[in-house]
């Protein structure tokens, strides 16, 4: 098991429970996802960490909300499996003041535990940020979790090689947890020159938070757009047709909403034309900072 991931997960968990909060563990998990998606380039990671550690609570929470809003726009196909996280930030239940402070502390704890070292381009495909973190949060802390972890990364890597998953047109995982075996299969594909975007990833678990974590991991691991995730008991439910229908309906609604937004933007632009900008007087505009770049 990756020691750096365990340290980060323990830091997040200790910070959350240190604020005497026992419920709504979707908040620290979704906050971790939103920050992890930022994934600055190696040369920018120290500066990004320092900058984000300087953010106050309102700035941090605003950034997390903006990340989940962007996720909903860019990946409506994952909106249903990610619903616990999306609703945590964009739903009707506001965070309490204690929860807001706890989320801010969680983000700072993850950053101090070198979160961005785990999301660099040469590292992000080899780790699962959520398996250990979810286990510890569900157990109530590191001292209570025992050995109830999801499949460790090195075991998943071995299983992927044994199962020979690199030549499949689709990969099905009927008890996926946070997606460790999918990560291993995708990493093995890359090692052998195959693009994981060419595969359909089909995964289900009975735990809705594990599936929400996997939806976040789809972005971190860059699994592409052929992804079908579901929350169901595979022993009693025929979940795939239902999941395909829900995904299609959500994408349709998202496309209609996007078209409506563009029409509204066009109407506003016609009613309030933007004046022509004055000629620049001091050279080229500054390049965007790492924090201003698209994260997903």
Predicted feature descriptions by range:
Residues 1, 118-122, 148, 203:
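Generic alpha-helical structural element
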Residues 1-76:
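Charged, often flexible domain-edge or linker segments that flank or initiate folded functional domains
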Residues 15, 117, 136, 140-143, ...:
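Alpha-helix C-capping/helix-to-loop hinge sites
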Residues 25-32, 127, 131, 153, ...:
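Non-catalytic, well-ordered alpha-helical scaffold segments
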Residues 43-139:
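Long recognition/docking surfaces used for binding and targeting
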Residues 145-240, 244:
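Conserved S-adenosyl-L-methionine
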Residues 211, 216-296:
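S-adenosylmethionine
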């Amino acid at each position: 098991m990756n020691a750096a991931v365990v340290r980060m997960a323990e830091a997040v968990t200790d910070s959350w429970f240190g604020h005497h909060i026992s419920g709504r563990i979707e908040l620290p998990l979704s906050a971790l996802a939103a920050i992890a998606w930022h994934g600055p380039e190696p040369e920018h990671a120290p500066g990004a960490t320092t900058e984000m550690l300087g953010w106050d609570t309102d700035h941090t929470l605003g950034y997390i909300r903006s990340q989940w809003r962007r996720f909903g726009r860019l990946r409506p196909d994952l909106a249903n499996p990610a619903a616990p996280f999306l609703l945590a930030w964009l739903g009707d239940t506001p965070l309490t003041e204690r929860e807001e402070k706890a989320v801010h502390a969680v983000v700072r704890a993850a950053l101090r535990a070198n979160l961005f070292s785990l999301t660099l381009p040469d590292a992000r495909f080899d780790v699962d940020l959520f398996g250990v973190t979810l286990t510890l949060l569900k157990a109530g802390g590191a001292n209570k979790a025992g050995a109830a972890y999801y499949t460790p990364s090195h075991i998943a890597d071995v299983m992927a090689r044994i199962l020979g998953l690199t030549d499949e047109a689709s990969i099905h995982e009927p008890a996926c947890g946070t997606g460790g075996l999918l990560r291993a299969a995708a990493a093995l594909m890359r090692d052998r020159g195959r693009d994981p975007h060419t595969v359909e990833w089909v995964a289900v678990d009975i735990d809705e938070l594990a599936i929400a974590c996997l939806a976040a991991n789809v972005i971190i691991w860059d699994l592409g757009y052929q992804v079908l995730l579901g929350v169901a008991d595979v022993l009693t439910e025929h979940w795939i047709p239902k999941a395909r229908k829900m995904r299609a309906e959500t994408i349709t609604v998202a496309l209609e909403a996007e078209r409506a937004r563009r029409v509204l933007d066009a109407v506003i632009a016609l009613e309030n034309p933007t004046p022509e900008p004055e000629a620049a007087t001091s050279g080229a505009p500054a390049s965007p900072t790492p924090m201003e770049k698209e994260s997903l």
